[in-house]
Amino acid sequence: MDALEAPELLLLPHLSALTPKTGFLIGLALAITAYCYYRHTQHPLYKFPGPRSAAWSNVLYCYYYIQGRQPFKLLELHNQYGSVVRTAPNDLSFNTAGAFRDIYNFRPGHETFIKSDWYDGGVFADKAHSIVSEREPGKHGHMRKYLSHAFSDKSLKAQEPLIDEVVNEFVSQLDVFGSKKGGIDIVVWFNLATFDIIGSLAFGESFGGVKSGEVHPWISRIITAIGQSALADAFKRFPKFATTFKWLFPKAIEKMLEDTAGHENYTISLIDKRLSNPSTRPDFLTRMLENRPEDLTDVQIAAHASDFVIAGSETTATTLSCIVYYLTKNPSVYQKATQEIRDRFERFEDINSTAASQLKYLHALALEAMRIYPPLPLALPRVVPKGGDTIDGHFVAEGTIVSVNPVAACLSTKNFDAPLEFRPERWLESDLVDDHEASQPFSMGPRACLGRNLAWIELSLLLSKMLWVYDIELLNTEVD
């Protein structure tokens, strides 16, 4: 037998000459090639468009998330690839109203799209889940049932004097601090007000920010923690990166853990203080305790209260800041808003949430602000149930992580005409151009924001009272 009859004999000398290191590298290269081939041609999501690197790695996803630019990158990708984009090996992003309904809303005959493990990072002390972090639908429904009493129309009406107390002090303090040369940073002051309101309702006492004009240290810690959530998600997607990061930056990890423990301990101390002093004050805790089930522990009450503070403060302040910015940039919009408020109320004392909620232009202002600058710009990831399901006409395999990014949806020319223009009138006119349902600042379905009515009360009272009393202008003309 010669080499022509057995060509494999020609390879044997070369193969036997390979060093273990070379063999390993060749094997690794073949494995990577096979992996990439599978991700691009055989994976259940291979047919969906997106950057090639997203098919085989989470690097692109995490890079922009940690940078804080992910929402705008997703807008760019949707403009390039269409209404559905593969953003990671097992992730799809959508940007349509239909996808909002299919992913988040209740659909008869369809299984629930449960929250992804992204929410596991929100577990409180002693592994207590809250209304936000609980992923199991049955347990979440149980929580929502006993918490809903605190957010009912009757409860919110009883809570309005507590809200008004902060709002009125806010208006007074604007005169004290705003009369100084250089004006005030209204973003800071809106945060002081909304944190004070939610503190009063969640813990029975405000943080005193409006009175002092200073940010409470605990609030600074919360805002920092929100920014760290991106790093936590990256650790989940790259466990080895997490190990390396902890080894390279032990002090940074230690600081993060200390901040988390400090936040939890302070929250628990506030709850313990409130529980030790029974009160009929019509706040969240009173309503929660009135309807307290046997399985609701003190730590879990603290977890819920923590969620209320995080979800119900900075988001509202963001919307208020956005409104004021566009009011100062658009004289005609400013004139319409102030005229509506000042024509409606003869006296400052006449302004209340019921009357303010009937101000149509003010309502449109808020809707447009939440569209052009979503207060929660991050997508809320869900998992496609067993057997797969259809989303906006696309069949998606089970186990896929799916979501709608608010920025990608609200700033898409497919959903809104001239999406970068601040145009409150789009919410007052009947037109066939804008798809209003593509903007869902409070989400929808069984996991929709429990405090949306509270948010509307805060928005309407703070804006109407401030604009009834003051004329405002943007002093820093370089702000854009």
Swiss-Prot record:
The GO molecular function terms of this record are: heme binding; iron ion binding; monooxygenase activity; oxidoreductase activity, acting on paired donors, with incorporation or reduction of molecular oxygen
- Bilayer disposition of the protein: Single-pass membrane protein
Database matches in PROSITE patterns: CYTOCHROME_P450
For the keyword Transmembrane helix, the answer is yes
A Pfam family this chain is assigned to:
p450
UniProt-annotated binding residues for heme: 449
- The lineage's top-level taxon is Eukaryota
Segments traversing the membrane: 9-29
Q: Where in the cell is it found?
A: Membrane
Q: Which residues are glycosylated?
A: 265, 352
**Enzyme Commission designation:** 1.-.-.-
Q: What does this chain do?
A: Cytochrome P450 monooxygenase; part of the gene cluster that mediates the biosynthesis of PR-toxin, a bicyclic sesquiterpene belonging to the eremophilane class and acting as a mycotoxin. The first step of the pathway is catalyzed by the aristolochene synthase which performs the cyclization of trans,trans-farnesyl diphosphate (FPP) to the bicyclic sesquiterpene aristolochene. Following the formation of aristolochene, the non-oxygenated aristolochene is converted to the trioxygenated intermediate eremofortin B, via 7-epi-neopetasone.
- PANTHER family from the UniProt entry: CYTOCHROME P450, P450, PUTATIVE (EUROFUNG)-RELATED
Q: What's this protein's name?
A: Cytochrome P450 monooxygenase ORF11
Question: What is the species listed in this Swiss-Prot or TrEMBL entry?
Answer: Penicillium roqueforti (strain FM164)
The primary gene name is: ORF11
